[in-house]
């Protein structure tokens, strides 16, 4: 009985050891590559966390393929853990109009991260979607989704837009859609 318990314990230990990811690249899905990544201490635990945006390797300018956004938390033992994934936040490559790919940047500050977009033609627009890590619930929620737009011939006449304001500080990261 003791030998059997030792074998089971060893198998469980080795399985969990090999399941841990030691590199951000270990989270890249088959057929995808990293479009962008940014690091910071999102969950305020003292370890480096990452926001990673993936792109489909077969993505073309006209494609409307998903661009997964991954939240990856650094762990005490030097490994990484997937804390969240959402395929509906990063706008498609063709969604930027004449400007092409609207994706602009990821920014991280404290326990917030934002995904920034810019696009348009004569009518230009920007959009910033921000999420906040809630240290009590240990989850990410939508903090703000807003942007601005202007006509290229009248750049001083800026219009401000709030998207899904009724969901701010309520909807979880995993279920939010930028549509």
Which residues make up each language-model segment?
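Bacterial Sec-dependent N-terminal signal peptides
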Residues: 1-23
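Blade-edge motifs of beta-propeller repeat domains
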Residues: 20-32, 77-100
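Acidic, small-residue rich beta-repeat scaffolds with periodic aromatic anchors
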Residues: 22-24, 107-179
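Short consensus segments that form the blades of beta-propeller domains
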Residues: 27-28, 58-65, 119-122
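Beta-propeller blade termini
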Residues: 33-42, 101-110
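Acidic/hydrophobic-patterned starts of short beta strands in beta-sheet-rich repeat architectures
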Residues: 42-54, 107-117
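Beta-propeller blade repeat segments, especially FG-GAP/WD-type strand-to-loop junctions
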Residues: 61-86, 131-133
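Short, surface-exposed coil-to-beta transition loops
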Residues: 66-67, 101, 123-128
């Amino acid at each position: 009985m003791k030998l059997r318990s030792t074998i089971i314990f060893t198998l469980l230990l080795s399985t969990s050891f090999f399941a841990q990811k030691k590199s951000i690249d270990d989270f890249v899905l088959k057929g995808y590559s990293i479009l962008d990544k940014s690091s910071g201490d999102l969950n305020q635990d003292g370890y480096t966390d990452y926001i990673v945006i993936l792109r489909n390797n077969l993505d073309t300018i006209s494609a409307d393929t998903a661009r997964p956004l991954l939240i990856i938390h650094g762990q005490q033992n030097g490994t990484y853990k997937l804390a969240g994934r959402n395929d509906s936040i990063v706008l498609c490559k063709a969604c930027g109009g004449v400007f092409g790919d609207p994706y602009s940047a990821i920014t991280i500050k404290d326990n917030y991260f934002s995904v920034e977009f810019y696009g348009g033609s004569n009518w230009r627009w920007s959009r910033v979607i921000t999420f906040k890590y809630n240290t009590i619930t240990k989850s990410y929620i939508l903090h703000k989704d807003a942007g601005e737009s202007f006509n290229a011939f009248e750049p001083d006449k800026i219009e401000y837009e709030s998207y899904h304001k009724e969901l701010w500080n309520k909807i979880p990261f995993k279920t939010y859609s930028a549509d």
